[in-house]
């Protein structure tokens, strides 16, 4: 794509529009009070912010911490009209002080910098810079609520930057077009080498992230361990946005695992799945749906049963997370009680999968102590419902490296099961 066309795309996407709804005003669950969260997987909810600020994860993904604080500071000091005067990140319209505006401005600067690197023949620097641009655009779109017009435009830029980086990176990255229900969604496969068949890990994140956010998992963990990594978005998110989230959380993953046999480089006898948060619900479910195609399934802080069946646990969730769940389910303007009445159907225990029979796929349930989403009993359900299963609860301190400690444990498990 030429520089001019890229510029035109950005200008076209973010051209001023009337009546663009601000993110926090999209779902509007009735009579809802927000709670706080503070943990390694989700980040921190802070007074005065609608969004949960995922500082440690964003830094880990490649966001510059000084730049991040400057962005947040510009939002905080803005005098523009807000949806809620008490919430700093609710400036209305694509203008200075607006969450999406501030993050996309930095993403655009990085895109321009990357083009300069390309012209100078510095492809590796250009690839790294484009990956960073993709992360800034993804944070701009966070938490990826359906119907958020500006966020959808930021997602387009995130995907564009990620695709451009793929063409330049020394790593081997390809797209996989997966057909399902007469439509197609895209997954990405990341390859440490292409001269042999590789053990492969399918990965899905939560409901508030894009598959491009998972790049660091490949670079720091799967790639060095010799695993190929295949990512896909959860239903209703990113490349999978044309499918609503239903209690059949694993249906897109099932379509992928059924078609992955046709993908070069993948050792079909050594395929695993890892899911984070709601992605873990899909991962464990897939183990029951496709036990002959998977060697192991892993839940990292998964929304498996407890959170979905105990309304009191949702009382400890920030409003943003409840908005995300409601958005994925297509529930707008409903009461909290109406929302929670639908969630038990997502419980893998209520679906008759966990706690009733053992599947031959060894499964790992892992979380940090005091996890607000995944209780120890959830991991124990996973352990008891699979032959060779295991439940692990890691210390929740130090907070900043909880993600790393979890992934080290995951890699050790995969090396054993995919040997």
Curated annotation (Swiss-Prot):
Coiled coil: none
Enzyme Commission number, as recorded: 3.1.1.1
Pfam families assigned to the protein according to its UniProt record, in alphabetical order: FrsA-like (PF06500)
Catalytic activity: a carboxylic ester + H2O = an alcohol + a carboxylate + H(+)
Domain of life, per lineage: Bacteria
Example GO molecular function: carboxylesterase activity
Keywords: Hydrolase, Serine esterase
Family annotation (NCBIfam families): PRK05077.1
General function of this protein: Catalyzes the hydrolysis of esters.
Family: Belongs to the FrsA family.
Name of the featured protein: Esterase FrsA
Organism in which the protein naturally occurs: Photobacterium profundum (strain SS9)
Organism ancestry: Bacteria, Pseudomonadati, Pseudomonadota, Gammaproteobacteria, Vibrionales
Gene: frsA
């Amino acid at each position: 794509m030429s520089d001019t066309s890229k510029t035109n795309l950005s200008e076209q996407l973010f051209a001023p529009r009337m009546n663009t709804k601000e993110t926090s005003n999209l779902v509007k669950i009735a009579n809802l009070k927000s709670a706080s969260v503070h943990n390694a997987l989700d980040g921190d909810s802070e007074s005065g912010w609608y969004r949960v600020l995922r500082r440690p994860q964003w830094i880990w993904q490649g966001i510059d911490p000084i730049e991040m604080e400057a962005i947040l500071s510009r939002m905080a000091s803005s005098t523009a009209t807000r949806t809620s005067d008490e919430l700093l990140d609710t400036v209305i319209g694509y203008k200075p002080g607006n969450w999406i505006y501030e993050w996309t401005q930095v993403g655009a600067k990085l895109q321009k910098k990357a083009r300069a690197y390309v012209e100078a023949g510095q492809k590796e620097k250009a690839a790294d810079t484009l990956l960073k641009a993709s992360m800034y655009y993804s944070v701009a779109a966070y938490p990826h609520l359906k119907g958020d017009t500006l966020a959808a435009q930021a997602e387009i830029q995130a995907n564009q930057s990620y695709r451009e980086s793929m063409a330049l990176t020394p790593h081997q990255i390809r797209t996989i077009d997966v057909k399902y229900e007469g439509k197609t969604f895209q997954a990405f496969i990341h390859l440490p080498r292409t001269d042999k068949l590789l053990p492969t890990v399918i990965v899905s994140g939560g409901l508030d992230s894009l598959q491009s956010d998972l790049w660091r998992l490949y670079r720091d963990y799967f790639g060095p361990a010799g695993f190929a990594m295949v990512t896909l978005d959860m239903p209703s998110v990113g490349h999978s946005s044309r499918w609503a989230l239903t209690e059949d959380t694993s249906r897109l993953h099932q379509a992928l695992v059924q078609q992955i046999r046709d993908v070069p480089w993948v050792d079909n006898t050594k395929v695993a799945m890892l899911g984070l948060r709601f992605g873990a619900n899909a991962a464990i479910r897939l183990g029951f749906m496709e036990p002959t195609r998977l060697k192991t399934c892993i839940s990292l802080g998964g929304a498996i049963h407890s959170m979905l069946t105990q309304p009191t646990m949702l009382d400890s969730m920030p409003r943003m997370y409840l908005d995300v769940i409601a958005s994925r389910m297509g529930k707008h303007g409903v009461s909290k009680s109406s929302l929670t009445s639908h969630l038990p159907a997502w419980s893998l225990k209520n679906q008759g999968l966990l706690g009733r029979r053992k599947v031959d796929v060894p499964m790992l349930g892992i979380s940090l102590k005091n996890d607000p989403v995944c209780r120890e009993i959830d991991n124990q359900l996973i352990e008891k419902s699979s032959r060779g299963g295991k439940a692990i609860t890691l210390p929740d301190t130090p907070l900043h490296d909880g993600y790393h400690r979890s992934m080290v444990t995951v890699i050790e498990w995969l090396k054993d099961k995919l040997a």
